[in-house]
UniProtKB/Swiss-Prot annotation:
It is found in: Endoplasmic reticulum membrane. This is Delta(24(24(1)))-sterol reductase. The lineage of its organism: Eukaryota, Fungi, Dikarya, Ascomycota, Saccharomycotina. It comes from Candida albicans (strain SC5314 / ATCC MYA-2876). Its EC number is 1.3.1.71. Residues 1-13 have a biased composition (Polar residues).
Length: 469
């Protein structure tokens, strides 16, 4: 869920991919992440199993950990309970396949047909410093998708809550696509196109991390951008959207908790869509490779593991999670404040990056918030030509957008309460991810900027929480 995490820049013409990069990393320079090949294999196997387990526990075990009943062996439990429920409810029907495939294809169609704006990415040394063009219209795609879903719902063609009602089968479909597309893309890059970079020579690890940097279908449909910005957050939004419709049809009203989830996921989906062109020049788009980690996680992992709050509310009766008016209002206010800092902070660092590059034309897409753009911001000029922002929210905390992002996710779980462990999966997992990324970036920046990084730390001494951490 975290947006791109660096506020440093020289300009948009400074390559992020080193000029000495080769297709294979020298053996003595390989630095494995995520536990290396064994860790990568464990995650490729473990994450799909975890997603299925959490869904089964949420739907069939009252939101508690699915465990053997008294006197039941683990073998019988796995075969008779878990596997049988997966077979009955988790194997996709033709409708599930058609729905998810259609959703992906429609989003791809919107990507290449709806209005938008053009921007350019970072110069890429593996393409002789070429800057790839990006067409950004996710905001149009988002609201067109909402209108289309409402038309289909009220004409009786497809209820808005179809995905929520069939979440097991559709999740399996997404898992299948995530795994199979990762394998297919890796094999094509290795044996057909030769588009692979920074490889270790270990196929398991390399497929997990990815082979290509900027895979595209045709000239403009960038797969990394497509799957990162649209698919996961649109799915989460429509699960929440469906939850509200389902509650209204079932109870005649929509609970504050369901409204909160819809509001929370609208905030994030809209933020990703409206800020799409700000993602283009980031480290993620220019440097991170596109493999299982990004492809699977965006098409399946994010939407169908981060949705546990939605599932908890969907599968429990409203009286289970009724809170006081004051508590509900507090969480609505808290997420709104956190979103303000998240939105304006990301805008500050990205508008700074683009203005330094001489490109100050940025859309003011709804909601455009006060203090989003800095006037004459302060910065440190580094010996390598880069600029480090020391103004705005970042003078208080270098990763303040991480903190604001995390507070948003925390409110999701707080709105569900403590009756089930699964709504807390995302905040716990996300905390680990953000801390890992924060200190990873610290090491990379210290290596990249040297003594200038020490100056930067003097100006911006705190990472996550002002005066604390």
């Amino acid at each position: 869920m975290a947006a791109s995490d660096t506020q440093s820049t020289s300009d948009e013409t400074t390559p992020l991919v080193g000029s000495d990069e080769s297709r294979y990393i020298p053996k003595d320079q390989i630095e494995y992440e995520f536990g290396g090949p064994i860790g990568a294999l464990g995650m490729m196997i473990g994450f799909p199993l975890l997603m299925w387990y959490m869904w089964i526990s949420a739907q069939f075990y009252n939101g508690q950990f699915a465990l053997p009943s008294e006197g039941q062996s683990w073998k019988d439990f796995i075969i008779d309970d878990l596997f049988s429920k997966w077979v009955e409810y988790g194997i996709p029907s033709f409708g599930n396949w058609a729905f998810f495939t259609g959703f992906i294809l429609i989003q791809a169609l919107f990507y290449v047909t709806l209005p938008g704006v053009w921007t350019k990415g970072q110069p890429l040394t593996h393409l002789n410093n070429k800057q790839l063009p990006y067409f950004c219209n996710a905001i149009w795609s988002f609201y067109t998708s909402i209108v289309l879903s409402l038309v289909l719902h009220f004409t009786g063609v497809l209820p808005v809550y179809y995905m929520l009602d069939n979440v097991g089968g559709i999740m399996t479909t997404a898992i299948f696509y995530g795994i199979s597309l990762s394998i297919i893309l890796y094999l094509i890059c290795i044996f057909v196109t030769g588009d692979y970079h920074r490889m270790t020579g270990n196929h398991i690890y390399d497929m997990f991390m990815g082979a290509p940097l900027n895979p595209r279908i045709g000239k403009y449909l960038d797969l990394k951008m497509f799957f990162e910005v649209r698919i996961p957050w649109f799915i989460l939004f429509f699960l929440s959207f469906g939850l509200c419709f389902k509650q209204y049809e079932t109870y005649g009203y929509v609970t504050p908790q369901a409204c909160f989830m819809l509001y929370a996921h609208w905030l994030y989906a809209n933020a990703c869509a409206k800020g799409e062109e700000l993602i283009v020049p980031t480290w993620d788009m220019a440097y991170e490779k596109f493999g299982f980690m990004l492809l699977f996680w965006n098409i399946a992992g994010v939407p169908f593991s981060y949705c546990q709050c939605i599932l908890y509310i969907a599968y429990q009766e409203p009286e289970v999670y009724q809170w006081s008016i004051g508590y509900n209002v507090f969480l609505f206010v808290l997420i709104t404040i956190a979103y303000y800092f998240f939105d304006t902070g990301n805008r500050q660092k990205n508008s700074f990056r683009r203005s330094v590059a001489g490109n100050s034309q940025l859309r003011k897409t709804f909601p455009y918030l006060p203090y989003s753009d800095l006037v004459n911001p302060k910065y440190i000029k580094c010996a390598n030509g880069s600029l480090l922002l020391t103004d705005g929210w970042y003078v208080y905390a270098r990763k303040m957008h991480y903190t604001a992002d995390y507070i948003q996710t925390l409110t999701w779980a707080l709105m569900c309460g403590f009756g089930s462990p699964f709504p807390w999966f995302f905040p716990i997992f996300f905390f680990i991810v953000l801390v890992h990324r924060g200190y990873r970036d610290q090491r990379k920046c210290a290596k990249k900027y040297g003594k200038d990084w020490d100056r930067y730390l003097e100006a911006c001494p705190y990472m996550f929480i002002p005066y604390v951490w």
